[in-house]
Curated annotation (Swiss-Prot):
Protein's organism: Methylorubrum populi (strain ATCC BAA-705 / NCIMB 13946 / BJ001)
Key word DNA repair present: no
Record InterPro entries: Asp/Glu-ADT_sf_sub_c, GatC
Family: Belongs to the GatC family.
Record-listed E.C. numbers: 6.3.5.-
Protein name: Aspartyl/glutamyl-tRNA(Asn/Gln) amidotransferase subunit C
Quaternary context: Heterotrimer of A, B and C subunits.
Length: 95
């Protein structure tokens, strides 16, 4: 797959990037080099290779999914000028 000037301009338009006319050619070359590299990656034989999610084997620490207030409500509202029952009090905006 190769990228032409029209495709470079379309990508720039979709990304909302202003590209000067003199920059279209170099960008075309860079995008074609990236696509060539991706095509090389597709040719790599990965038969029998287990997918990795991390470079070191580790298990995720899991906890029970429980709804709670975190036990820190008083710490959260401690710096608020006014509070009531662990809620922030703010001035009325609409009468």
């Amino acid at each position: 797959m190769s990228v032409d000037e029209t495709t470079v301009r379309r990508i720039a338009h979709l990304a909302r990037i202003a590209v000067a006319d003199e920059d279209v050619g170099p960008l075309q070359g860079e995008l074609n080099a990236i696509l060539a590299f991706v095509e090389q990656l597709g040719a790599v034989d990965v038969e029998g290779v287990e997918p990795m999610t991390s470079v070191t084997p580790m298990r995720m620490k899991k906890r029970a999914d429980v709804v709670n207030d975190g036990g820190r409500a008083s710490d959260i509202v401690a710096n608020a000028p006014e509070t009531e029952d662990n809620y922030f009090l703010v001035p009325k905006v609409v009468e």
